Amino acid sequence: MGASPIFYLHSMHEGVQVSSKLEQLQALLAPVVEGLGYQCWGIEYVSQGKHSVLRIYIDKEGGILVDDCEAVSRQASAILDVEDPISSEYTLEVSSPGMDRPLFTLEQFASHAGEQVKIKLRTPFEGRRNFQGLLRGVEEQDVVVQVDNHEFLLPIDSIDKANIIPSFD
């Protein structure tokens, strides 16, 4: 995937602290995004030492333009300045999910059934952490992916990153 952004809702960089930080950011920012008329596709918070990156993915019918990202960035920055949920330096990035869109929720996985995906787990499952194959759908709290002729049920809570693999057929 090269330099393409690949993300999942829960980062384990600092364990539970990052997860609860991410949940706090989601609760704070999703209403802002939705209030501007966009879908909050997902939020990623990555702590990298003294500097962090906060990424907000937005979507809407017909696609996202740079002006859309700018509008969300302005509003999100204002809320973040007032609420101050991140104590360290950070960079705010707002973008569309893109063609290789990250998948964050069971609903997103279900709606992209039939597409090729790349999934990375936090810890190995059946001896592996990386899965690339056909997204079959979801079953309860598991994502079903077919790799070669073998079907894997991957618990959504164990997924670190998941992305659609764009098809150019």
From Swiss-Prot:
Annotated keywords: Cytoplasm, Ribosome biogenesis
InterPro entries the record matches: Ribosome_maturation_RimP (IPR003728), RimP_C (IPR028998), RimP_C_sf (IPR036847), RimP_N (IPR028989), RimP_N_sf (IPR035956)
Subcellular location per the Swiss-Prot or TrEMBL entry: Cytoplasm
SUPFAM superfamilies found in the cross-reference section: YhbC-like, C-terminal domain (SSF74942), YhbC-like, N-terminal domain (SSF75420)
One family name in Pfam for this protein: RimP_N
Record-level GO BP terms: ribosomal small subunit assembly; translation
UniProt-listed Gene3D superfamilies: Ribosome maturation factor RimP, C-terminal domain (2.30.30.180), RimP-like superfamily, N-terminal (3.30.300.70)
Any one annotated GO CC term: cytosol
Domain of life: Bacteria
Coiled coil spans: none
Protein family membership: Belongs to the RimP family.
HAMAP family: RimP (MF_01077)
NCBIfam families: PRK00092.1-1
Cited function: Required for maturation of 30S ribosomal subunits.
Protein name per the record: Ribosome maturation factor RimP
